[in-house]
Regions:
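C-terminal intrinsically disordered, low-complexity extensions immediately downstream
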Residues: 155-172
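Glycine-rich ThDP/TPP pyrophosphate-binding loop and its adjacent helix/strand module
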Residues: 1-155
């Protein structure tokens, strides 16, 4: 589906921003051992579209700025684009996965020090003089929004099976 979507988006110059969250693993396999690519955004060249990699996608401000640039490019009618965000999956891939034992402990420790939420809190305090109380208010508000969204999803009706294929284009 990825290649077909990118090919059609490029062919029709669709305003599509494809974001690849590269956490370096395909379930438990290190992607760097599975491909000769250093960056997945280089796949964009095969579709004749631009691809950009954010090497430190744990910096929230950098991700925001690069996403805004990419969105502006796409919205301006230039066609699709790939934006790769290199980050780290701190937990396992799925509940039935055996944790993160397959990861290099030194690399895991290095990335855990770069937790995006902690880095953003530090940046807000150091560069913007945001106080601990304000950070706590933000965290509490986000937690409340998540709880409300979860509660809504728990009681929301399931979609009807007969509409599952609505708006799906299949050119077979």
């Amino acid at each position: 589906p990825f290649y077909e979507a990118m090919n059609m988006a490029a062919a029709f110059k669709l305003p599509m921003l494809m974001i690849i969250q590269n956490n370096f693993f395909a379930i438990s396999e290190d992607f760097r051992k599975m491909t000769g690519l250093q960056s997945l955004s280089t796949r964009a060249a095969g579709f004749g579209i631009p691809g950009v990699t954010v090497e430190n996608a744990n910096d929230v401000e950098t991700v925001y700025n690069e996403t805004m640039k990419a969105a502006e490019y796409v919205r301006a009618g230039n066609g699709p684009m790939i934006l790769e965000l290199k980050t780290w999956r701190q937990m396992g891939h799925a509940p039935n996965e055996p944790g993160t034992k397959y990861k290099d402990p030194a690399e895991q420790a290095m990335w855990l020090k770069r937790d995006p939420i902690k880095l953003l809190a530090t940046k807000l305090k150091e560069q913007y003089q945001v106080q601990d109380e304000q950070i706590k208010e933000i965290e509490d508000r986000v937690e409340q929004e998540l709880d409300e969204a979860w509660a809504f999803a728990e009681v929301a009706p399931y979609s009807l099976p007969e509409v599952a294929m609505d708006h799906i284009y299949a050119g077979c």
